[in-house]
Design a protein with these regions (language model features):
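Structural signature of nuclease core domains in nucleic-acid processing machines
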Residues: 1-343
């Protein structure tokens, strides 16, 4: 549930903050890290669940299971960051009136719109006077980065925050020139595996690692990839990339030029949405993966909307899978730059 997801995120953020104050994750033993997790959870119980002992046995069981899961997730995040030159620079970074950065502003002739939001974590790597930033979002569900969604103007938040940090983040991060290095969805959940009782522990661990692999898009630069994960160019474990036998790196990669084009595309979509809002266009026009997986599934306005696919003019628009070259060609078309040339 969303409530459990918030607990996961809160404990991870609090533990990472404490670890940073203690000198960084690389200075902590696993026992010390677990002690920080337990201290964070105890503080949460005192503040939010002082009556935990009075809760049902089922609730206490689920909460204790959650606490154990947080320890495992933090072990995994710790291992990732200890094998990386990127370090957490900000947690719960907010854009808006009460945030560390101003709201994202979209100006049109007939008005101004402002976007507010929050980034779970921002990691950075300072190299040759430039600060490479990546935006990290914790996901408690199965959400993953998807080019098809981007093509339909969905799932743009992470990229929007990344590109905004490039323009507005210097004052917050020491005045260095900022280079967008990517966006990552980090699983913040206890993975569930189906396996035989006699499955070897090594195979289980390998399967767990696979379930907890990040999704996203990262800068196609060998130095940056190796800074993100020291073994990225040989045997990546965390990043959404793979290495072929000939040493070529494949996966969810984008060149600096492509990220620039993506920034322009995101800006275009924002202006398009703003114009629609100012024009009063609020038609129900939902997207869907399948009839059972659509924008309507968790919509808070479903009871007022009464959209019914196939009834009258109500038609669900289905998201089609998008290949990498098709995606970049589409981005070029929207940006008015012609066909994308693959090098």
């Amino acid at each position: 549930s969303r409530g459990l997801g918030d607990v996961y995120k809160r404990q991870m953020e609090h533990t990472l903050r404490q670890a940073k104050e203690c000198g960084g994750l690389h200075t902590l033993s696993k026992d010390k890290l677990h002690a920080l997790v337990r201290a964070s959870i105890e503080e949460y119980i005192d503040r939010v669940l002082p009556d935990l002992c009075e809760k049902s046995a089922r609730f206490r069981y689920l909460f204790n299971r959650l606490c154990a899961a947080v320890e495992r997730i933090m072990d995994e995040v710790s291992e990732e960051l200890q094998s990386s030159d990127f370090e957490p620079l900000a947690f719960e970074l907010a854009f808006g009136a009460d945030g560390q950065l101003p709201a994202i502003t979209i100006r049109e002739e007939n008005g101004t719109a402002r976007v507010v939001g929050k980034v779970d974590r921002v990691d950075g790597w300072l190299h040759d006077g430039k600060l490479y930033l990546r935006v990290v979002d914790y996901k408690t569900g199965k959400k993953s980065f998807d080019l098809a969604e981007l093509r339909y103007g969905l799932g743009l938040q992470m990229l929007l925050y990344l590109f905004t940090l490039k323009e507005e983040g210097q004052v917050l991060f020491g005045g260095h020139e900022i280079v967008p290095a990517g966006v990552l969805y980090t699983p913040a959940r206890e993975p569930m595996l189906r396996c035989a009782r006699d499955t070897e522990p090594e195979k289980i661990e390998k399967a767990l690692k696979k379930e907890l692999r990040r999704s996203g898009m990262v800068l196609e630069d060998p130095a940056v990839l190796q800074a993100m994960e020291h073994s990225a160019l040989e045997s990546p474990c965390y990043l959404p990339i793979a290495v072929k036998r000939d040493g070529a790196v494949t996966g969810s990669l984008a060149s600096a030029e492509q990220l620039g084009k993506l920034s322009k595309y995101v800006d275009h979509i924002l202006h398009e949405i703003t114009q629609e809002v100012f024009a009063g266009n609020i038609d129900a026009d939902p997207y869907a993966r399948t009839p059972q997986q659509s924008a309507c599934t968790y919509c808070e306005f479903a009871s007022a909307c009464h959209f019914e696919n196939g009834c009258g003019s109500d038609r669900m628009e289905y998201i089609k899978a998008t290949k990498n070259d098709e995606f970049w060609q589409y981005i070029d078309e929207v940006n008015g730059e012609g066909a994308h040339e693959n090098g």
